Amino acid sequence: MIIGVLSVQGGFVEHMRSIERLGHEARAVRRAEQLEGLDGLIMPGGESTTMSKLLELGGMLEPLRELIADGLPVFGTCAGLILLADRVLDTRSDAHSLHAMDITVRRNAFGRQVDSFETQLPFGDIDTPVEAVFIRAPKVEEVGDGVEVVSTLPDGTVVGVRQGNVLGCSFHPELSEDDRVHEYFLRMVKQRGVE
C-alpha cells in the first residue's frame, strides 16, 4: 500500500513516520505527477491559506479534486481538514478549498498557540480513546446529511468527520505515538480493495 503525504508545507514528516511504523510505504507528494499510483493521501496540518496557495501554484488543486471525486481515500488533519471543507469561516478571500466534505469549519477555533492542549477522545469504532493534540485547531460547526461524526469533545464539539472516502479531524494524531487514527484511515483504504 502506498500512502501519499502532501508535503508542500506543514507537519508531513510525522505523518510519514506513522504510516511507515504501520508497515506501509509513505510517499512525499510535492507535485501533481506524484499523485499517480497512490492508494490514499494524507493532508497534514500547517497553515491552510499558505497550503492552498502552494497547491494552486503547483497545479495540484484540480488533480486533487478529481482524485477525491474518483474515490481516492483522503485524510486531512487540522489545516488538511480546512482544505477539505466546503465552507470555511474566518479565512482569507484568496484561500482555496477542495470542497470534498459537506461541512463548515472555523479556523483557529480553539484560540492561539498558547491555547494548545492534549486530551483523549473517542474516534470512530476504535475501542479506547485516542491521543489528540490540538494546536490552533479548527472546529466543525456544521455537518451535512452525508457526513458521519466520528469524534467529539466532551462538550459535543465536533472534531472528527467522515464522508465516504474522506476523513478529517481537527487535531494532530501524528504528534503522538498512538497510530490508531492512521490505522483507521488505512482500513478505509483497504475497504477499496487495496492491500
UniProtKB/Swiss-Prot annotation:
Recorded GO cellular component terms are: cytosol; glutaminase complex
In the record, what terms sit under GO molecular function? Answer: glutaminase activity; pyridoxal 5'-phosphate synthase (glutamine hydrolysing) activity
- Write out the residues that bind L-glutamine: G46, E47, S48, R107, I135, R136
Its keywords, alphabetically, are: Glutamine amidotransferase, Hydrolase, Lyase, Pyridoxal phosphate
Please give the catalytic activity noted in the UniProt record.
Answer: aldehydo-D-ribose 5-phosphate + D-glyceraldehyde 3-phosphate + L-glutamine = pyridoxal 5'-phosphate + L-glutamate + phosphate + 3 H2O + H(+); L-glutamine + H2O = L-glutamate + NH4(+)
Which catalytic residues are annotated? C78 (nucleophile), H172 (charge relay system), E174 (charge relay system)
Matches recorded under Pfam families: SNO
User: Which InterPro entries does this entry report, sorted A to Z?
Assistant: Class_I_gatase-like, PdxT/SNO
Hydrolase is among the record's keywords: yes
Q: What is its EC number?
A: 4.3.3.6, 3.5.1.2
Which biological process, per GO, is one annotated for this protein? pyridoxine metabolic process
Q: Check the record and name the SUPFAM superfamilies matching this protein.
A: Class I glutamine amidotransferase-like
Question: Does the keyword section mention Membrane?
Answer: no
Q: So, what pathway does this thing act in?
A: Cofactor biosynthesis; pyridoxal 5'-phosphate biosynthesis
| Assembly description | In the presence of PdxS, forms a dodecamer of heterodimers. Only shows activity in the heterodimer.
**Which family, according to the similarity comment?**
Belongs to the glutaminase PdxT/SNO family.
**Main role?**
Catalyzes the hydrolysis of glutamine to glutamate and ammonia as part of the biosynthesis of pyridoxal 5'-phosphate. The resulting ammonia molecule is channeled to the active site of PdxS.
Name of the protein in its database record? Pyridoxal 5'-phosphate synthase subunit PdxT
Source organism per UniProt: Corynebacterium jeikeium (strain K411)
Source organism lineage? Bacteria, Bacillati, Actinomycetota, Actinomycetes, Mycobacteriales
